[in-house]
């Protein structure tokens, strides 16, 4: 379980032994106006549910990536063709090279990576101690 500074709560789970999963790195945001779902196994899609839909016509809709989204058009000129894992690696490499040459900022930077590591350590310690643990408590630990 997680609790954010703004009061939002959530849950995180991880498993390397979940049967039937290949690369189910995913997140789901459930909010007052709807739900948004991303799954790495289908990374060219977002699933969106909007709470204000008419009864009987409600349900998730699938938003597909296309040329209007980021670097997609550099690989595919039209929607529906989808980019793959290798294209993502090319995009990541280009962004890294641009950062090395000072054309863009690198993300995450070392400070952000440190903050992410504190969150992971807080989660590990919280699980080990069966208590709430804040990333702020992980300073210099």
Language-model regions, residue ranges each:
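Hydrophobic residues in alpha-helical segments
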Residues: 99-101, 117, 126-127
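C-terminal glycine/acidic-rich active-site capping loop/insertion
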Residues: 3-6, 33-107, 139-141
